[in-house]
């Protein structure tokens, strides 16, 4: 039998970095319905957050963006997404995202965390949406 999964974590990563919340939600729902492992979805999201932090740190140390991206193995469509997102991503936001990824890592492995859903998929959705909002082309206006 062929594996004809409609969604994959790498496309999810691109949708999150592109700041497309509706697409991200649809993909998360699809990955869950297809039985994808929560830890794999978490890995993809956390790896993007860690890569954003590494590239920001390299740029802060004086490295040009193209070199920082290459050293972190970011190329192709992700390279363009990183180039667009990085200037808008502040240090405080990056720190919050790293902490959230750490919390969700525990949740998908069965640990509880205060102020976070106990269900792994709900926690992944929250993490994905936090990252997605940080990557949106224009920040949402407060209501």
Give residue ranges: language-model regions.
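Charge-biased C-terminal accessory regions appended to nucleic-acid-, cytoskeletal NTPase
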Residues: 67-143
């Amino acid at each position: 039998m062929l594996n004809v999964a409609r969604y994959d974590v790498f496309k999810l990563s691109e949708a999150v970095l592109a700041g497309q919340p509706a697409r991200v939600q649809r993909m998360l729902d699809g990955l869950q319905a297809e039985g994808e492992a929560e830890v794999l979805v978490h890995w993809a999201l956390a790896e993007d957050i860690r890569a954003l932090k590494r590239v920001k740190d390299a740029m802060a140390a004086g490295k040009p963006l193209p070199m920082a991206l290459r050293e972190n193995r970011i190329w192709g469509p992700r390279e363009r997404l990183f180039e667009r997102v990085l200037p808008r991503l502040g240090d405080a936001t990056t720190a919050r995202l790293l902490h959230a990824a750490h919390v969700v890592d525990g949740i998908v492995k069965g640990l509880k965390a205060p102020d976070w859903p106990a269900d792994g998929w709900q926690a992944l959705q929250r993490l994905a949406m936090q990252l997605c909002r940080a990557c949106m082309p224009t920040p949402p206006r407060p209501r």
